[in-house]
Structures are given as structure tokens and as C-alpha cells.
Amino acid sequence: MVMAQQQKNAERNDEHTRRNRSPSVDSVSRVQQQSGGFAFYNQQSNHQYQQSHPRRTSFSRDGNTGYYNNHSGNKRQTYNNQRGGRSYNHRGNSNYQQNGEYSGNQGCVPKYHQRNQNYPQLQPKYSYFQPHQRPIFNSTQGYGTYSVRRSSPPSPSALSSSTANSTSNRAPTQPPILLRHAEPASDKNHQGSDHEQNHDPKIHLYRSAGTAPGGYTQCPSPYKQPPPQPPSTPSSSDKRIEQQQAEDWPTRFQHPPPQFRRGQDPMPASIELQHKTANQTMPVDIVQTNQQKTVSSYERAAQFRASASELPTDSVDAKHPCFANERMQSALIGISPQLKTQQQSPGIPIQNEAEASAVMKAMRSFQFHNWPQMSHGSYYPMPYHLENQMRPMKSGDQLPLNQQNHNLSGFPAFVGKSSLVGSSLNTRNSSEADPEEMPRIMEKLDDEVTGADHDKTIDENRRRIHKSQEPRIGTEEKALNELPRKANRRNSSCSSISSVSESSSPSALDESTLTKILPTDNFRGGRGFASPSPPTSLLSEPLSRMDVLSEKIWDYHNKVSQTDEMLQRKLHLRDMLYTAISPVFPLSGLYVVGSSLNGFGNNSSDMDLCLMITNKDLDQKNDAVVVLNLILSTLQYEKFVESQKLILAKVPILRINFAAPFDDITVDLNANNSVAIRNTHLLCYYSSYDWRVRPLVSVVKEWAKRKGINDANKSSFTSYSLVLMVIHFLQCGPTKVLPNLQQSYPNRFSNKVDVRTLNVTMALEEVADDIDQSLSEKTTLGELLIGFLDYYANEFNYDRDAISIRQGRRVERAALAVRPKIHSNSEGDKETPPPSSSASTSSIHNGGTPGIPMHHSISNPHFWRSQWRCVCIEEPFTNSNTAHSIYDEMVFEAIKKAFREAHGELQHNHDLDKLMECEPIKASTTNTGAAVFAATYEGERPLAQQPNTIACASLRVLNSIPVSSGPGHYHYQQQSNQNLSRPQRPGSNQGYQMNNNRGFNGNNQQQHQNRRSFNNQSSSNPGNGSTGPRSSRSNENVRDSSRQQNSQKGSSGVSVSKENVASTTGVPVDKKQQNSNRKDDGNRTKRSPMVQSPEPAKTKSEKTPMASSNVSQ
């Protein structure tokens, strides 16, 4: 009896083990055939979903065993079984779209959650190799599919027998892709094999791209080419297969997985980098092993290059773009001692120690400074062929990676120091530099600084745009210092930084002066870009008051400008945030935008980030809030995050404060606001065009801040609007300094260009313009500042004209203040911006929130007319008014008076100190703001969630109730997940139902029903007189209004606090909106919706203005 029971238990355990282990090749094929190539999993309960019943593709709604079917009311996901992938319901508050449109015949499933790695899943055909996983070779598909669960490779005998027929008559036509197994096999399926006991962990398998499906052969020793096979005549179908494989080969394997990122789990010691293909870049600066040994990525790269030199290259075109890039990478990354004696392959150009020494010398001056600036590094995985998501990030895709050719990588070129002085934009990527000319360039490096050929370069106020030639692989190219330049530039006569005398020599400049002009890192040095430098010399004698004013402007700019150390800290913080966000949005890109990178920032500037999750327009009212809610919930478990605020402005942002040592940096994160990336790209070129642009902007922004006219919450200018005003003055003022880049380079600065192809390091071709260089270069900084104040105080007609840097001139207000059409996909409306893009970017560029409440939109005719009321500053890409926050006539008159007073003061005494010693304008205005959802952490931080609660955590954030904080404004309070499956009861305040379909209600739109109102705390207890927002973290009705505090402890450990920021919107309050949610004895008293407890009604004489707190900038 006991034996029978034991035997039955053993059989049950074997069956359980068989179902949960990684599927073998046969089981994978069987699952693919029966279920269309897909295995479905229950992501909530974190267990394999009906693996034994692959035909069952529907999900049960009972018992929390799977995602529910499509339900438009609760915005849940739906699965698309016909296409073989899952698509998400793009409605309202749902898990944001991660459409996995994979073909059903590839045997793959949607991308798994990064923390949910215990599912045996099949990856797409063109997948990156994850070194912590073990491959499973599917002989019927012709490529390796990978499983998250560790499993041993098939036995060598099985591989050789299964592929002997397919590889016997064909020679490799392309470089093989190495797959190294570093650990002996331990799978139960192979323990009985004769070859398993003697399996050599160093056996390497390689697959040639030209082999037949399943063409894997065993190499007897590492990195040795198998004996050549006799050639055969392939059929027409084989030729088509080979041609397709040849086209796909450079992109067949994507970048390494997120495990390579900084600060991630240490890499296993048994895993080496030999699996990386020749066209991949190094992932990180530091890689750790299990022995806690710190190994530089340069050393690992050198090892990889040494091993890669033994790759078979008989039938490889040495001029292939991938190998052209390989030559540059080999030169930049490092030289291994093994390369000095081994025979060099086409990918290794270093021939002797002299070249190696030259390359190492260049590495000390030119680091990898291009790709990680605006976006995350190229080692983050990206999807490949999804229409509604980001494509795989390749070199050039993300700003500021160079080149749109995806096979080329964005490394800087070797240029002389004189080229860096001549133009801050003169950098090329690796494809533009011939490795053979590098030693010659490096030998001339010192001569270029002190040589007679460059005596006019350092002390010359030359323009920042030079002609460049389009690179071509395999052809002879000229170095940057040999490219044609516009000659006969006159030296600037700006006496504050006047030119060097004829007797002066560039060699006389001391080292400290050269350090300021020639940063060791052109892109990162100093200000994110190498700031355009004026001529370097002492002031001319005798000095005038204008000279002193110009010198003070320049000194102030150098004092407040963003330093290189601050930029590095911001970039490191960006990497930390992306590491935390990528598990939730693994197919996204995180861009640095705004003043931190466009050249106009300082050390106190916030860092603005843009999370791009799709290349389509995103509804900023609804979908963007959902995305930011997910990020807020994710970051609450990160210890380096101190607090978060979700600001529901016109462009919603998530304001993040950090713990030490990053407590002095504030991050404003927005979702899919691509216009911020385009603006950053455009302003980068304007700021680098002439050396006088940045100092002038720095002084104007500081003066406006001290004068109190640089705050959108107080009906004044934003920093972005001030920058556009300075650029417009330099384009249309008495002395023209800047051209119109959008007209001169329409293909470069167009709103149709994909933001992932934007590049801020490529030089622009020289074009003809109407700028008088002789007059422009004589104008000093002091004269430009006085002219700027005079232009906007006396010359500019605010009633008739509008500012437009897109057209490079003053335009009539009537031409711009035309109500645009609602966004359409028709051919005639391609240029019309969508509603989500027409929002002001003030919250992106200066951390502020737009002054007009978010419920206003272009669909409201009154708002569209009112936003052009006072001053019109056209946004260069969306054609909206960036100064729409200035709607108060009294404040606008005070602003114009401030310009007149400043101009008179500076024109009279030329004293910058007195200009800065000004008092704020005296104009009373109601404070404007947006709803704020603040999340602070008190006590112990919530524990990190287990993998089986990841899906539930996302749903908990999605099912948050908006609580009214003013007419048309809502902030969110998390609630229990129990309301998902319960019916909606009148007055229970459990749902997310509103009469209007947009999710937000404006003053003139449909009103809430009383039973659906979010302002009604408890309609089941109407006698309490409470009108404040109801805290619905549980299903109990709050009967005592005194229990409503400013912060309520949530079930997840997050304290949610309300700020009365949006209690005053600056617009008349709709009486119907206030009275619809309140019942009195026939007497309806006007009251702010943000009142938390009942209070006596006030008479008209006792009414006081509604108080509000400022949104911290």
C-alpha cells in the first residue's frame, strides 16, 4: 500500500517536472504547431498557463488566473490570437501599449516582463543573445531560440547528425555568429547520452548565414574554421534565401540585454564576450564578475578583438559597413598585446606599436562622448519591426548618435584642436574617418595649435557652421581640417574680448587659456557642447564703458553656466532612472531635453527627460497620465527617489526629487512629448552658431527672474519663450547675427523628421544668407543686450506683430492666431499638429507649468482666441503660442514697463550690476497652476514586489480614481484592486466612469451626474455637507469629515497628499459645476471644490480670494 502510494507520488512529481521544465525541441515544435507558434502564460499568478493544453487560447475570468477579455469599461487588455501576438486595448487607463506584432510562423511569444523570468518562452527570430541563458537549438527553424530557464545545449552527436546533410555541400558566405557554452550540460534529457559525460564546456558552435536551416556544426576547437566544403550550385530558392539572409545579417542580433547596464547584477564569471558579433558596441564602462573583479570594458573589448581576429573572413567583403565600423572601434577601444604579433583581419587596422600609441593617445583626449548624451546608450534592447513602437535602437537612431546609416556607430572622429576651436559642430563619426590617416592626424596634433597655418583660427570669431562632405565607405576621404572652409573671416572688434594683436602668436597662449577653449571632450566639455569661444586676448586699451559691460556679461555667463561635472551627474542620474523604468517599458527611449543639453542651462537648472514609448502621437490628457502613473508606482521602490509629484498640466509631468547625493537635482519627466526633442535639437544649433548667443541668453534669463517676469504661474514669460525672443532679436534686430536655420535646412529641422534620427553633432553645409558679416562681427555683447531691451521696449508692436523664428521675421498676429483644424490623418492635414503636440512646452524647458488650465484646448474657440491676446511667440514646430500664459492685461503692461526701465537704466550708465539690482514688478494676479498628485514616503519604504505581484501592481495604479481639485482638474488617488470585479454602484465612488468620454471635464462641457461625481464624498450619506474629494483607498464610506486629512496612508505604503495648487485656476468658476455636487436647503452657496470640511456659508462681504500654493519650479 505504501509502495503504491510512493510510486503514484513519484509519477505525479515526474509529470509536474515535465510540465514546468524548459520545453525540448520536439515539445516546442508541437506547441508551435498546435497553438500557432505561441504559448500563453498567466502573468498575474506567475505560473505557466496551460502548457499542456496549447489549443486553449482564451483566458478565464474566474479565480484571477489570467487577464480578462476585452472590456472597454475597465480598460483591460485584449489578446489578438489571429496575429499570434498580444495587443493592448489603447483606451483610457490601461497598461500602455506594447504591441507585439510577431508573425505566427516564427515561433515566438510577446516580450516577457523582465522580473518575470521564470517562463520558458521563445524569443523572436532576430533576438539578442542573453549570456545568462542557455540556448535551445531548433533544427527546423534555422536559428537558435532561447529559454529563460537554464538548459544545456544538445549533444554534439545530435547536432552533427541533424545538420550533416544541410551543411555538407555549402560553404559559409558570411561571418559566423559564435555561440559559446561556458558550462557543462546538466539537463535530464542529455544525461544518458554518450557524449554528455565528456562534453567539453569550451566547444563552440558557429552558424554560417549561408547554411541551410538548422545549419549548425561543431567546431573541434575554439574559433577554428571547419574544413572547407566542396562548392555546389544552389538552387534559385536557395539564392533568394541567401540574399535575404545577407540583407538581414547586420541587424540579425540586437544589442545586449539590460543586464549589461551599469549597476546591474554582476555578470557570471563563466560568461565571456565572445558571443558578441562584430557590429555590436561595448555595453558599459565597467563590468563586474562573480569574483567581484572589476574589469574595464576596454580590456574586455581588447580580448574580444583578439579573439575576433581568428574569425573566418574568406568570403567577407572587407569594405562592408560593419567592418568599416569595426576598424574604428578597434582603434578607439584599445589594443591587445596579442594583436601586435597576430595576423590582422579586415576589422583590426592596427599594424604596429606606433599606431597603437597614437590611438591610445587619442583616447585620452577623445572619449566616447557622442551616444550617451541625449538618450540612453546603444546597449539597451529595442524592438525591431513594430509599426507603433520604437524600432531597435541602432547607431544614429537616438540623439545624438551619428549617421542615419544604422550599420554605423556613432564614435567621434579624430580632429585637430584647431578644428574644435573653429567649430563646436565639427565632429564626425567613425565612418567618416579613415583609420589609415589617424596616425598622420595625431602627429600633427601639436603643430595645429602652434603652427603658422592656423594663426587666425583661435582668435577668430568665425561662424559655427562649415561645409562637410558626405562620407562614403571605401573611398578616399579628407580629414576635417582639410575640408573647405569659408575664408577671409574678419576678427571680431568686440573690445571686451578683442582679437590678438598682429605681434601675438597662438603659441603664447598659456595652458589654462587653451583648456577653456579646447575642452578634452568636445561634446561633454564645459556645457554639454564645447561652448563657442570668443577670440582670446586681453582687453584693448583704452577701455570704454561698453567694453566693461561686455566683459561683465561674459564673466557672468562663465560663472552660472552648467559645468561638466553637473552634466555628468545628470547623465548618470538619467541612466539610473532608465534602469528602474525599463522593466515596465522595456521598448522605450529616455531622452535628455531642455536646457540641460541645448546649451542654455546652468547648474541650478532642472533636468528634463522625455520617455518615448511609441513613434505615434500620444494623448497627453489621458494616456500620458497613465504612463506617468505607472512610472510613479515603479519608482516608489527605488531608494534613491525621495518624493514624486504628478503635475497634470497641459503636458503632464512627473516631478522627481532624489536623495543624496542627487538631492540638488530635480527631474521633470514627460511621456512621448516629441516636440521637446525637436526643440532641443534646434536650439543646440542656434546656441552653437555664434559665441554671443549663450551669454546673452544667460543674462536675459537672470534679469527676467529677478524682475519677476520669468514665471508662467504668475502670468509671465517662460524660459523657453525668453530664449525664442533672444533668437528672434538676433535674426530680425538692427544687427543680424543668426540665420533662419529652419528655412536654410528644411530637411534637417522639419517636424516630419523622426526624432530618433536627429543628430546634433553633424556640421551643416554652408549656405548663402543675408547676414552682413562685417557689421555683425563688430557688434559687442553690451550693444546686443541694450539692443534687445530697446527692441522689445520701443520697436516691437505687440498689437500687430508676432514673433516667429520659424519664418525668421515678424509676422502678423492675424496670420498665426487662426484656430487650427483638429488633427487629421488626411493628406491635406499633415502639417496640422495634433492636440497633444500643440501644448506649450514651458513645463519641459524650464520646469514650470503652463499658466492656462489643462481643460482648455484648441477645441475651445474662446481659449484659442484668448491665448493670442497679449503677446504672440510662435512655437517653431507646433505653431502654438508659447507665451499663452500671459493673459492678464495688467501683468502684460507691467512687463512692457520693465523692458522700458531696464533699457533706460542700461543705456544711461552701462552697469550690469545695477540692472540686476531690480525689484519685481508690482502687479497682482491670481496664481495659475495645475493639479498635483504628490507621493511622499514616510517611515519604512515599501518592500520590493515579488514577480507574482508585478501585474497586480500595474493594475493597481491603473485603477486610480481622479479626485477633483478644481473645475476640470483631477488628481489621482490609488485605490484597492477589488473594484475591478465589482459592479458600479451609484454613489460608491468605486469606478472611473465619467459622462464625457475624454476622462476630463471642462467648464463648458458636459457635467457630471451626481451619482458619478468625484467631488461627492459619500452620496450614501448626503447629510454631512462634505464637498471635498473622497479618499477611496477602501470601499468604506467616510462618514466623519474630520477624518479627511491632507495625507492618507495607502495600502501600498505610499502616503498620498493633496496640494491646493489647482484651487485657483485663474478663470471664472462655473457655477453649475460647483452647485451640481452640493445639496443645501434651497440656498446654494458658491464654494471652492477643494474645501475639505463643512464650514459656515459666507456672505458677499466676507468672501476672500481662493488661496493656492505655487508649484515648485
Swiss-Prot record:
Q: Where is the PAP-associated domain?
A: 780-816
- UniProt keyword annotation of Magnesium present: yes
Looking up Pfam families in the UniProt record yields:
MTPAP-like_central, PAP_assoc
Q: Where is this region: Disordered?
A: 1-113, 134-175, 205-266, 445-513, 817-854, 966-1113
Query: Which residues fall in a compositionally biased region of kind Polar residues?
Result: 60-106, 972-994
Subunit-level organization: Interacts with gld-3.
Protein name (database record): Poly(A) RNA polymerase gld-2
Organism this protein belongs to: Caenorhabditis elegans
Q: Which gene encodes it?
A: gld-2
